């Protein structure tokens, strides 16, 4: 079943916050990314998490990016990581990939994330998508993949044109291949899950999104929404 998803749909799903609410009610999230020279992507993602309403935001990134993150968003708890790192306890949703290059540092970080077990859901975006093909991704965690058409083509081993010619089938194929929910970005973004027959098409957006960093923001908005409560205690 195909359904339309738009701003009105999203607005209806977000609760008005209780006057008794506190930061612990709105999730603990972490962004992992930002190789040397690409820290802006990870910083944008962590900032978008704040603006989307996450209760607590962590950022694990290359040490060279920590100062810039703290200057721009002191609310974000930024950590510099070298070859390995430890996740804080009880992360609800983890976003891995913004600003990750296809290099050894990034690959080590990716492997640390996939082998960790102290978070709920993992969103794999941008650079992290390079590694799931060569690593035959195996994790029991709930996964969301957020490829643009070029990344989708690499995940499926087909051409960009083939993805664009049948975006619905491409999204479903990725979802089934990796047992993951998928957000296939682009004109009429496709949202689907491997364990649900429903499929959503989002008609919002336009050419104003054709700019570096918008995908990093989208991934953060998406994963932050997963941490927000669907109800409050009476």
Predicted regions and their residues:
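Small-residue (G/A/S/T)-rich helix-start motifs and N-terminal tracts that mark the onset
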Residues: 1-121, 130-144, 153-226, 231
């Amino acid at each position: 079943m195909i359904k339309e998803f738009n701003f009105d749909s999203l607005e209806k799903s977000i609760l008005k916050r209780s006057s008794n609410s506190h930061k612990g009610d709105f999730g603990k999230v972490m962004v992992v990314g930002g190789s040397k020279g690409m820290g802006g992507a990870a910083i944008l993602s962590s900032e978008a998490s704040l603006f989307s309403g996450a209760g607590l935001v962590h950022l694990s990134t290359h040490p060279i990016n920590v100062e810039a993150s703290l200057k721009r968003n002191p609310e974000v708890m930024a950590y510099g990581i070298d070859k390995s790192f430890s996740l804080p306890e009880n992360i609800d949703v983890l976003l891995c990939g913004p600003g990750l290059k296809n290099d050894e540092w990034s690959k080590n970080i990716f492997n640390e994330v996939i082998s960790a077990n102290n978070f709920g859901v993992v969103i794999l975006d941008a650079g992290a998508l390079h590694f799931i093909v060569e690593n035959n991704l195996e994790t029991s965690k709930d996964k969301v993949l957020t490829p643009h058409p070029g990344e989708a083509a690499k995940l499926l081993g087909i051409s960009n044109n083939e993805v664009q010619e049948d975006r619905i089938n491409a999204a479903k194929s990725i979802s089934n291949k990796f047992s993951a929910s998928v957000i296939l970005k682009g004109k009429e973004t496709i949202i689907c899950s491997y364990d649900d027959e429903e499929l959503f098409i989002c008609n919002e957006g336009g050419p104003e999104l054709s700019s570096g960093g918008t995908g990093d923001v989208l991934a953060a908005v998406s994963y932050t929404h997963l941490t927000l409560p669907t109800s409050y205690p009476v």
